[in-house]
Amino acid sequence: MEKSRNTGNFLFIIFWWLVQHLNIRWAHKLLYWGLRDGSFPSGHVSDPILGIDLFGRHLSTPLGISDGLDKRGNILDTLMQMGYSFGTFGPYTLEKEMPPNEKFFFKKDKAIITQCTGYRNPGILKMMPWFVKRRYLPHFVGIDIAIPAENEESNIKQGRHFAYVDEFVLMSQRIAPYCDFITLDFSHTNSELCVLMVDASTILPIIRAVKETVKQAAPIRPPKVFVKIPLDLNMMEIPLVAQTLLAGEVDGVVVAGPMSLAKNTRIRIQGAKEHQMSGMVIGQPTHEYTTELIRRLYTHLKGRIPIIACGGVFDGKTAFEHIAAGASLVSVDEASLIFEGPGIIHKIHKELIEILHHKKFHSFAEAIGCDTQEVISETNASMTTKQPQTTPTDSSVPPQQI
């Protein structure tokens, strides 16, 4: 155990030196190698204030691992052992999809730009033996599933929205006995389902069919059903999306990247504009937009559906901003781990505990949506004070007759 801890600390020093002074791509490779080997030390900080009861479980921390980090079953369980309370494999399509994929790292902005037209993954069918093998591990783990972009385009042109239902149902049926939650991924910026997220006639049948399928496939303990929405949503579309999620009675909603550089002029990444780069971005530049999206969604959901957030979380402050906006859980993504290293979990836990105690919260649950609730209260109070006050000249005359 001591040897493993020393090895982990040594790897962490090398990793951090590579990020700060040399080559982020090599740090990226070292990160995955170290996690696959299980060499990095635990970063869990035990404090009851971080605990929350959610989805029929007690989670010791609101911090988890986003999808996109582990598509081959190599590192997620190692990360869970480091102290994260939940994690997501994927995203996966039914069969293997390997579109061209290139990543660009921007250290100063703590951002990663990916140029990829689809969901690069080995496919659910190939991963099934691994899911079966790890089914009895105690970790609270989900699987993210999606439809290939080319399938979506073909189905939309032919008006065959039912094809989405069939494919999501088939994937859900296979994985339901082997996970704690299933995430229906509508977030890819190149995805037509991303555009149709506001169309209840397309999304609701998928949600309802999957919920019914998982009950039949895993009757004793059916997995929860989450929906992952795109960050590229127009803020004016949030009420429609919230109505669809409530009507579908989903168990959770995931608000996460990536964001499209082409669609979001607010995103500024040093070097990307000069080279006229396009693609999808994760990391620090998405944080502000993610927080605002959480706040608006929380307002319309009225706390009835837990929000799982992921977007530019690099310390306790940015994690708390998501929580205060309305997120019940917070995920770290690939950018967080690469630019801050595996030690980010200890950093976030330590700083989050300090923030919660400083703000006089007795439990983590009390902090969820605290900023948003204040904004709602102020807005309601403002609307009340701005109502015209009619003062009758004669108290015997009813106000409507004046």
Segment roles from a protein language model:
Residues 32-45, 189-198, 238, 242-303:
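Glycine/Thr-rich beta-alpha phosphate-binding loop at enzyme active sites
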Residues 67-70, 144-148, 229-235, 303-317:
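Glycine-rich beta-to-alpha transition loops that act as phosphate-gripper elements at the mouths
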Residues 74-79, 233-247, 299, 313-330:
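Catalytic cores of alpha/beta
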Residues 88-96, 254-261, 313, 319-347:
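Glycine-rich phosphate-binding active-site loops on the catalytic face of alpha/beta enzymes
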Residues 92-140:
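A gly/proline- and charged-residue-enriched helix-loop-helix capping module
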Residues 99-111, 264-278, 336-361:
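C-terminal helical cap(s) of enzyme catalytic domains, especially alpha/beta-barrels
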Residues 121-138, 199-221, 274-305, 348-359:
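Alpha-helix-loop-beta-strand connector modules within alpha/beta enzyme cores
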Residues 151-168, 196-197, 202-203, 226-246:
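Active-site glycine- and acidic-residue-rich loops that bind
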